[in-house]
């Protein structure tokens, strides 16, 4: 379905569509972004860095993308790295070289995005070691994301635009690195080698670094189809997520407007991606986590290992109070439900439909969410039980082909969150997707 030219229920079509994760990441956003990129003219990343990981399966081939938008897989697509990204150019070059086919011709980078240096990754590792000694490790990807955003917030970071003038960049670089080496007592760091690398990046990228605000707004006004790709997910938002167990950028709807320089009235449609169960990487509260054979089953069958870190993900039942909250802050119009096939083979499946206060027995108001760890500990999940199914559903191409119990599960989710579920993932590839019709 070409979502840019197709209205669904009370949701009007439009030329600017955003895809956002509704949980703790790893919902399978990459697949729906890949499907919709076929119809878009421009695909944009607005936040984060190499800590994101989108795995796209095209036939027998897997593409793991960390910085590049998923639109790079389509030759008709221009791909933009936005203002609020932090970009490790060594990682970006590796992705570009792995994909080949003149990918660089279709990439533009915001002059306002910040450069992530190797020293940021060293600092990330140092900070995690220090926190782990106190039992307070966040479980970061150690990709340098937090330290890079820290230098940005401290106003000593270096933007991509500075790389266009290498002599000026060199002065800024030496000042920054000397500052960080002194601050973190780093004795050995090869500045000369990294500067040589960055001279190469200067030659490669100097004409690809642009004012994306002007570019995107002109494209929107000329009715180009714009697909906006969220990295990480809502519950990892630096302000609105389960702080401090979050990422370092704004992952929710508000991040789009600063990350791309567009105003809210230009955004037509928001697609929320919901995994059929729940996963989390690293530390942090997780009320529906299954530390048992169910959790192990979901990890193995769902191949729940981080695209970036390769760490096994923690697994549990779908948490609807989380979705109610995320729907409020993201104004979600339609849903893509992913990885329904992973639940095949379970005798019973549970959905958390409410949070109940352990002391008072009161149910949490829907749309509210206890983000602080101490608050969350006051609640326990209230489950609704569903009968499972044994059938392999990976070859289902229409909703009616699903087993009755699978259909009941999907319709129950849709009923609770009062948002149409348009796409249902039933396997890893583009073709393993059911598109429901609402005409």
Swiss-Prot record:
As recorded in UniProt, coiled-coil segments are none
Q: In which pathway does it act?
A: Purine metabolism; AMP biosynthesis via de novo pathway; AMP from IMP: step 1/2
Which Gene3D superfamilies does the record associate with it? Adenylosuccinate Synthetase, subunit A, domain 1, Adenylosuccinate Synthetase, subunit A, domain 2, Adenylosuccinate Synthetase, subunit A, domain 3
InterPro entries (alphabetical): Adenylosuccin_syn_GTP-bd, Adenylosuccin_syn_Lys_AS, Adenylosuccinate_synth_dom1, Adenylosuccinate_synth_dom2, Adenylosuccinate_synth_dom3, Adenylosuccinate_synthetase, P-loop_NTPase
According to UniProt, the reaction catalysed is:
IMP + L-aspartate + GTP = N(6)-(1,2-dicarboxyethyl)-AMP + GDP + phosphate + 2 H(+)
Q: Is this entry keyworded Protein transport?
A: no
Q: What else is known?
A: Parasitic protozoa lack the de novo purine biosynthesis pathway and rely exclusively on the salvage pathway for their purine nucleotide requirements.
Family indicated by similarity: Belongs to the adenylosuccinate synthetase family.
| Full protein name | Adenylosuccinate synthetase
Organism listed in the record: Plasmodium berghei (strain Anka)
